[in-house]
């Protein structure tokens, strides 16, 4: 996979920048990730990403789940319909998102095996996520479209209008879309992931 264009957020807006891509790339597959994640096993990371594309092409919104290694209270958790198969990267429907549980609850999640850490890494088709944003958070899409209309192309970058961008609400896409949609699926990610 090779990025054709790059879009960076001017300030933290929890992935709202992705909806600015509506113009001209609605059929594109998008990989959304944070700059503060550590990935130790690049080969497994690439395998997980490449395997997620087939699911994204079926209009599934993919989020990656990391097998918990300890009862973390600083991460969100994802409950999947079935236990994730870490050998074949198969997608399982998301049952529930849980934000930063207490230690006792986190221990129960580890024992259950249907729970994984929310990596905050996403793959989906642009038009699929745009339709879900329009359905569940239309005001976010409207603000982002206004920002896009005043952006400037610069080589491979799209430079956003800072004033309009800062008007976009700062709400995670997990909350604004993924917790509400029926199209959310989780794929296992075993690559030495760490949120630094």
Protein language model features and the residues they cover:
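Residues at structural and domain junctions
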Residues: 4-7, 38, 64, 92, ...
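Short hydrophobic/aromatic-enriched beta-strand-loop microsegments
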Residues: 3-8, 141-144
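Catalytic core of tubulin tyrosine ligase-like
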Residues: 77-196
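Short coil/turn connectors at secondary-structure junctions
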Residues: 2-3, 26-28, 57-61, 73, ...
């Amino acid at each position: 996979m090779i990025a054709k264009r790059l879009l960076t957020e001017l300030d933290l807006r929890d992935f709202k920048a992705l909806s600015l891509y509506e113009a001209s790339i609605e059929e594109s597959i998008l990989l959304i990730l944070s700059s503060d994640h550590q990935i130790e096993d690049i080969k497994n990371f690439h395998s997980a990403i490449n395997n997620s594309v087939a699911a994204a092409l079926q209009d599934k919104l993919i989020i990656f789940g990391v097998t918990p290694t300890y009862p973390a209270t600083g991460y969100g958790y994802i409950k999947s319909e079935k236990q994730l198969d870490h050998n074949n990267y198969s997608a399982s429907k998301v049952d529930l998102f849980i934000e930063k549980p207490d230690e006792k609850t986190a221990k129960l999640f580890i024992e259950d095996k249907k729970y994984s850490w929310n990596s905050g890494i996403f793959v989906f088709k642009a038009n699929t996520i745009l339709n879900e944003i329009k359905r569940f958070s239309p005001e976010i899409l409207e603000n982002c479209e206004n920002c896009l209309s005043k952006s400037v192309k610069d080589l491979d970058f799209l430079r956003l209008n800072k004033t309009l961008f800062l008007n976009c609400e700062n709400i995670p896409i997990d909350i604004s879309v993924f917790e509400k949609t029926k199209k959310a699926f989780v794929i296992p990610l075993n690559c030495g992931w760490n949120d630094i």
